[in-house]
């Protein structure tokens, strides 16, 4: 609490240019620190430290982008409407970067099968132990350098902003195996 008060006070008296320079420095330092680490190491640390916040009773929380209704609601409405328009046998969904499954859980009723994929092994172990639905399964995989599961529809939601352009290119090169791909 005291640290927060000090930060607010410093922001109030520091020149705006100094604040921008500080934020550029922090981003560069974080990028440099993460450039020699695997995505598994980076994202495992994010969950372990609660960088995206903490959920109600869950040990894993993917942040407000996955839990805020005004953000998630329109996405779930659009994807579920699309899934309902398909024959049931064509609703095999692969969710790359499934995170804490808070969004995927809302789409599950419209899927003939759902495979959630994430690079964090502990998250995948947790989901496989906690989610007991016959159509849901979770797989640990590196979507950049690893194999992707088979399916009809691929969802990539709020993943690419965390990857470099080269990493995004590697993922995009693998997506032709899916009939439909939604990238948001």
Where are each of the predicted segments found?
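Short C-terminal domain-edge/linker segments immediately following a structured domain
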Residues: 124-128, 169-171, 184
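Short, conserved loop/helix-junction motifs that constitute active-site signature segments
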Residues: 107, 173-177
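A short, conserved alpha-helix within the catalytic core of class I
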Residues: 162-174
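A conserved beta-strand element that flanks and buttresses the S-adenosyl-L-methionine
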Residues: 155
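Conserved N-terminal segment of class I S-adenosyl-L-methionine
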Residues: 3-146
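Hydrophobic adenine-recognition pocket in adenosine-nucleotide-binding enzymes
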Residues: 159
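Conserved beta-strand signature within the Rossmann-like core of class I S-adenosyl-L-methionine
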Residues: 177-184
